[in-house]
């Protein structure tokens, strides 16, 4: 795997400033040592709507198990299929879960780093 994912809270202006800095580095021929995929939310409330404790539990279980069907994951977590299905689809939409060619879901990240800055 060897892929990392960074989650944080940034304003639209901060997001575009970071993207601009990365583009400048690319133009200068500077590439990151290891690519890191990113997901930013505008505020903590939105982040917590997507990243609930149950979804973190699901991510952890799926990462440990490897690729699973939603049915197998629901059984492992001892949760209702529909609830697991909904959570998997949300996590897939925001990029934290991927589907392999066999139709099974997996967490391809070795590390998910979350940064939450407190207001000054």
What are these model-derived regions, one by one?
Residues 88-89:
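Short, hydrophobic-biased segments on the C-terminal half of alpha helices
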Residues 93-102:
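A short, conserved structural fragment
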Residues 45-52, 69, 101-120:
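Short, cationic-aromatic polyanion-contact patches
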Residues 72-77:
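A short acidic, leucine-rich amphipathic alpha-helix
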Residues 29-57:
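Short alpha-helical segments that sit at the start of domains
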Residues 60-64:
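Short, locally clustered residues in the helix-turn-helix/winged-helix DNA-binding domain
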């Amino acid at each position: 795997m060897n892929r990392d994912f960074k989650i944080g809270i940034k304003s639209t202006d901060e997001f575009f400033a970071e993207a601009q800095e990365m583009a400048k580095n690319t133009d200068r021929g500077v590439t990151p040592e290891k690519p890191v995929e990113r997901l930013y939310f505008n505020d903590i409330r939105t982040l917590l709507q997507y990243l609930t404790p149950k979804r973190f539990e699901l991510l952890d279980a799926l990462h440990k198990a490897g690729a699973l069907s939603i049915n197998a994951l629901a059984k492992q977590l001892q949760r209702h299929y529909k609830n697991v299905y909904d959570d998997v689809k949300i996590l897939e939409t925001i990029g934290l879960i991927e589907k392999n060619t066999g139709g099974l879901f997996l967490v391809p990240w070795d590390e998910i780093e979350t940064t939450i800055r407190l207001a000054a």
